[in-house]
Amino acid sequence: MVSLISIVSVVFLLFTTFYHFGEARIINVGGSLDAWKVPESPNHSLNHWAESVRFQVGDALLFKYDSKIDSVLQVTKENYEKCNTQKPLEEHKDGYTTVKLDVSGPYYFISGAPSGNCAKGEKVTVVVQSPNHPKPGPAAVTPTLPPKPSTTPAAPAPAPPTPSPKSSTSTMAPAPAPAKSSAVGLVAGNGIFWASTLVAVIGLAFA
């Protein structure tokens, strides 16, 4: 017979696996399928886009490009800054490249096009947050102090006129007695319940 501990362990493992699959995403580099190219202007650089995205462990980057004239190279930080296409960490030339982000930290990608696309801005740095990295909280809001009250004292209100005493002739009627039907019904219902329970216990004892 399978132990309860084994069943619980398998259920927990399956839950954890499906949870991480649900969190993982496939992200188009640059925000669209045709963004892996020389940017139109510095304001549209791939790094500007990457800074606006929160990358997590398990995500995947999708590069789409013309494999006849371009490629994707994953390089070191030094080669990234120099646009050095020699000895990359990984080289992709299939035109539809998916790169899995398995660990946290920075990833550096440059274009391998011989026309020098990297120097023209076709490169991107992706920083993957650690699983325990806290999410940014909301900006602090400075409380607004209420305006100070006016120091000029207000004039006192005139005293109300004193009403003339009148003799009260009306008498208050006594409150009616509360109804007893609901309480009686509750007591009767409890009596029936306990009587039935007692009969059932006696029947089981002599069965």
Swiss-Prot record:
Keyword check for Glycoprotein: yes
Domain (Phytocyanin): give its ranges.
25-130
Task: Provide the free-text tissue specificity comment from this protein's UniProt record.
Answer: Confined to flowers and siliques.
Q: What is this entry's stated membrane topology?
A: Lipid-anchor; GPI-anchor
Transmembrane feature ranges: none
Protein name per its UniProtKB record:
Early nodulin-like protein 11
What role is this protein assigned?
May act as a carbohydrate transporter. Required, together with ENODL11, ENODL12, ENODL13, ENODL14 and ENODL15, for male-female communication and pollen tube reception and burst at the synergid cell surface of the female gametophyte.
State where composition is biased (Pro residues): 144-164
